[in-house]
Amino acid sequence: MEKMVVKDSDEKDRYSLEEIKNKVILGDALKVLKKIDEEIFDMVFIDPPYFLQLSNKKLKRWNVNTVVEGVNDEWDKFQSFEEYDDFIRKLLTEVKRVMKPSGTIWVIGTYHNIFRIGKIMQDLGYWILNDVIWVKTNPMPNWLGVRFTNATETLIWAVKDKDVKDYTFNREYARRFGIGKIGANVWVLPLCQGSERLKDENGKKLHSTQKPIELLKRVILTSTKEGDLILDPMAGTGTTGYVAKALRRDFVMIEINERYIEGMVERFKKPLRITDKPVPKLEKISKYLGLEGLK
């Protein structure tokens, strides 16, 4: 496709950093990670499958006769919790191997999967530093009218083990992005929307769970330095690398879906201009929600 894409193959048994730096590898994350050298990444961001366990039944909104659209992609389908847990365990085991001793990892999820992932991380020896709650200002309503609207996602931030002390934490950015004067672990920002959302040839969203630029900006600025190397083994539409490049960090991404990579390549042709300040309108939203008073 393009020079930024490396196609994995069974014949390839090892990747040097020079081969994959600032590139996306087209391949299976579990296979590709085994071919990467140990202890080279300063930070890892993972947006794994949610395992929503949606039924094939078309659910109708309670107040209008239209169908609810959710995440129903093949990559989100597993046969059981055991299969899902095994996949996550293997992924996190390989990721831990390629993290620097001082590296940190972020994993994002919803109530469907984040608690299982947190337990697996602790079982593997990771030491959780924080959870960060992303409050969505434009969440999908609970159209079925049977439960609360799910307006949050949780990010787990961790190091390789409890003895790690020299990880990067940029406190001023944390205070700037978190709510209240102390910069609490709550980030208020919208879902990916408008021109930021990548579309397919039919004008439909290319990826059902594309993460917003603002979210990755906050992750990267609070936990890395310029020149650091960032890994995203489930890159989707490439937001992690896209933001990393704009913030003068290096990256390696892995993605198995060729359509996502095609969209990613087109995206990278348009350089991202980004500021390290919170988006002003988001600050207004925080005040509207009554969150600015947190001490």
Predicted regions and their residues:
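C-terminal helical cap(s) of enzyme catalytic domains, especially alpha/beta-barrels
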Residues: 261, 265-276
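Intrinsically disordered, low-complexity segments enriched in proline/serine/threonine
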Residues: 50-51, 192, 273, 280-282
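Asp-based, Mg2+/Mn2+-dependent phosphohydrolase catalytic module
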Residues: 253-254, 273-278, 285
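Radical SAM enzyme core and accessory elements
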Residues: 289-295
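Conserved SAM/SAH-binding loop
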Residues: 27-31, 281-289
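Core catalytic lobe of class I
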Residues: 1-263, 295
